[in-house]
């Protein structure tokens, strides 16, 4: 990784590494090198779970353990981490083996989610728990502001359907527009049409379901529900 690329990704992350080799390792998939990011991912997963659990405990003093567990699961699950990775354009910085590169690993949700966890682990090792906690809370600031006990744990398709039903409006329609890639590594493009809105919403994902959820999420934002 050259100096310019390293500086760019650190600017995006909001953190400058003292030990640059930790950044490189966090971005290295096992297909590219024996010095890959899986151990960092293991560490980052535990740190993320703790930081989010503590944030929920502090922000919601009157809710029970069950609600906190569901909210934490929503915030640390793979697709949420992948969303953060997309926001950071992490796919551009991944070190992948030729096989993974050709099969589109740079956009695979699981690889992106694991990389976010690995970065958390690497930042902790490069600094301390206080620094990485502050950074995670910055990354999650808007998500922590929006989340609340109850129906926010439902997926976007369900929330969109329930919202439209509550307004006595027609249910949304989903159409496959494109399927790209080989059978084991496909990227789906879906259009979601809502009768009350003049535009359709494009969703993408590694499965039809994920693409539909992505499109529904965009419709909810347009409707002002999220």
Curated annotation (Swiss-Prot):
Residues 6-128 form the RNase III domain. The active site is at 45, 117. Gene3D superfamilies: 3.30.160.20, Ribonuclease III domain (1.10.1520.10). Its cofactor is Mg(2+). Residues 155-225 form the DRBM domain. It holds the Pfam family Ribonucleas_3_3. One of its GO terms (biological process) is tRNA processing. Digests double-stranded RNA. Involved in the processing of primary rRNA transcript to yield the immediate precursors to the large and small rRNAs (23S and 16S). Processes some mRNAs, and tRNAs when they are encoded in the rRNA operon. Processes pre-crRNA and tracrRNA of type II CRISPR loci if present in the organism. Homodimer. This is Ribonuclease 3.
């Amino acid at each position: 990784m050259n100096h310019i690329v390293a500086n760019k990704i650190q600017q995006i992350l909001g953190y400058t590494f003292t030990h640059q080799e930790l950044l490189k390792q966090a971005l290295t998939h096992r297909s590219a090198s024996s010095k890959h990011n899986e151990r960092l991912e293991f560490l980052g997963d535990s740190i993320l779970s703790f930081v989010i659990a503590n944030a929920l405990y502090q922000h919601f003093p009157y809710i029970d353990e069950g609600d906190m567990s569901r909210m934490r699961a929503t915030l640390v699950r793979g697709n949420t981490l992948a969303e953060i990775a997309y926001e950071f354009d992490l796919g551009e910085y991944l070190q992948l083996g030729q096989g993974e590169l050709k099969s589109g690993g740079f956009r695979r949700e699981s690889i992106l989610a694991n990389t976010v966890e690995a970065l958390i682990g690497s930042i902790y090792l490069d600094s301390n728990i206080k620094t990485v906690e502050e950074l995670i809370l910055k990354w999650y600031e808007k998500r922590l502001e929006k989340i609340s006990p109850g129906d926010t744990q439902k997926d976007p398709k369900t929330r969109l359907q329930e919202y439209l039903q509550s307004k006595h409006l027609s249910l949304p329609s989903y159409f496959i527009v494109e399927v790209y890639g080989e059978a084991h590594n496909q990227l789906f493009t879906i259009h979601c049409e809502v009768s009350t809105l003049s535009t359709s919403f494009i969703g993408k994902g590694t499965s039809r379901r994920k693409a539909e959820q992505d499109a529904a999420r965009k419709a909810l934002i347009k409707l002002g529900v999220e």
